[in-house]
Amino acid sequence: MASSGYNPYVEIIEQPRQRGMRFRYKCEGRSAGSIPGERSTDNNRTYPSVQIMNYYGKGKIRITLVTKNDPYKPHPHDLVGKDCRDGYYEAEFGPERRPLFFQNLGIRCVKKKEVKGAIILRISAGINPFNVGEQQLLDIEDCDLNVVRCVFMFFLPDEDGNFTTALPPIVSNPIYDNRAPNTAELRICRVNKNCGSVRGGDEIFLLCDKVQKDDIEVRFVLNDWEARGVFSQADVHRQVAIVFKTPPYCKAILEPVTVKMQLRRPSDQEVSESMDFRYLPDEKDAYGNKSKKQKTTLIFQKLLQDCGHFTEKPRTAPLGSTGEGRFIKKESNLFSHGTVLPEMPRSSGVPGQAEPYYSSCGSISSGLPHHPPAIPSVAHQPTSWPPVTHPTSHPVSTNTLSTFSAGTLSSNSQGILPFLEGPGVSDLSASNSCLYNPDDLARMETPSMSPTDLYSISDVNMLSTRPLSVMAPSTDGMGDTDNPRLVSINLENPSCNARLGPRDLRQLHQMSPASLSAGTSSSSVFVSQSDAFDRSNFSCVDNGLMNEPGLSDDANNPTFVQSSHYSVNTLQSEQLSDPFTYGFFKI
């Protein structure tokens, strides 16, 4: 029964989905499917629905297909499904069906050669909702077979109960065949990357559903900004792939910016669902130099860590170097065979002997091989020295490698005696029997002493119970060298130790090398150093070291290296460099 006061009309509750449905041919032999509603999802299927407003009662509904554009003409495609015949849907409904849902409607397409026959069939059946002229209906050139619209027409019963009163028809949104590229739903299936530089130019491969190469574009959108990807028709591969380059962003950025990327068809302004695309800020180090440096630094640090696991092997000290890295000045030896005299016998009756408190010692060896040079006589024995008697119980040495005799020493051996004259030498401590006191030399009765007597001194009667351990040169080499060397004063006897006091250390450190040496042309070989050796204690080497047999004259002999150590650490940067008697070492 019609409602009084208001005219009834038809309203579409849910429009059919425009895209995503495929039109089927009759030859496919299968159902054309159902037209989904526009709000349909995979989890919640919905269908087109309509409702008659201002009317409650029975009625009849007819649904036909018309063309996309106005004037809406009958379309050659057919509606198929339940309650469908001759290409259209028609059914009666009662007051209980509110609203009306159409879930079994499908679209079956016809071939192009069958289009005209289908239009004639519609005219004969009276299917012309908008009363378009017959001549215009037969003009099928402008008919788009890929797009249709649904027309909903309602008929109300008259007084006789026949459904003859028609309500104004209503047209739905267009429905596109998903199989046709010019009307199909646009969809981005996959891209090889979804980010790129803010400067643009990144090449992107995009896979999609069928598109027309002359009717498609890739669009980048963010608020009011819009840009398009750069590609040509040749970059569209078989309607399903597009290779394009990204456009540059509108401004420089410091942080990544996300925009929307979508496909758009210019002919109908259809767009696909959007996909996020991130613009990345421009790299400050475009060529990766910073990362290369970091990688190199990490490799170097790892190399250092790996090398740190290996302990450093102790290196053999080179010839002439000490344990602290100090070097001894190596000069030519006075002797041809490197002969070392043994230590003189020690006197055991010295009372009041102080306890040594300097345990570290040094030694100077005379084992350096060299050629025997000629030695001019540059020093003479003072005539004021008393004569020295020869003891018979304490010889100096009988173990010489060269022809060494008491009577063959040259007169240059007298140059050793001035070394015993210095006031500093007179204060040497008597901590061992091998020390000497030059003060006792003044009490000697003999005014002069021969070289043989000098090297035979070993008794308390001659040097006040303090014999000096010296090394004598060979007889055959005394007249051939211009650079003679005194042998050594040894500080390496653990039983005969001496310690320098703080005052002595300062004096030794302040001592000038020029005050400790004299040229070969000077009147004396040794210069008196009273300030330098004042109250300095020295000790002689023991017999075990001095009498070591088989001392090689080779400079690389380990025996020489072992006997070349000293530890008087305060003699830094001091070189006792007498060119005739000895070449003291450099620290």
Curated annotation (Swiss-Prot):
GO terms for cellular component: cytoplasm; nucleus. Residues 403-468 are annotated as: Transcriptional transactivator. Keywords: Acetylation, DNA-binding, Nucleus, Phosphoprotein, Proto-oncogene, Transcription, Transcription regulation. The modification N-acetylalanine is found at residue 2. Its main location: nucleus. It holds the Pfam family RHD_DNA_bind. SUPFAM superfamilies: E set domains (SSF81296), p53-like transcription factors (SSF49417). GO terms for biological process: positive regulation of DNA-templated transcription; positive regulation of interleukin-12 production. GO terms for molecular function: DNA binding; DNA-binding transcription factor activity. InterPro entries: Ig-like_fold (IPR013783), Ig_E-set (IPR014756), IPT_dom (IPR002909), IPT_NFkappaB (IPR033926), NFkB/Dor (IPR000451), p53-like_TF_DNA-bd_sf (IPR008967), RHD-n_c-Rel (IPR042845), RHD_CS (IPR030492). PANTHER family: NUCLEAR FACTOR NF-KAPPA-B PROTEIN, PROTO-ONCOGENE C-REL. Component of the NF-kappa-B p65-c-Rel complex. Component of the NF-kappa-B p50-c-Rel complex. Component of the NF-kappa-B p52-c-Rel complex. Homodimer; component of the NF-kappa-B c-Rel-c-Rel complex. Interacts with NKIRAS1. Interacts with NFKBIB. Interacts with NFKBIE. This is Proto-oncogene c-Rel. The gene is Rel.
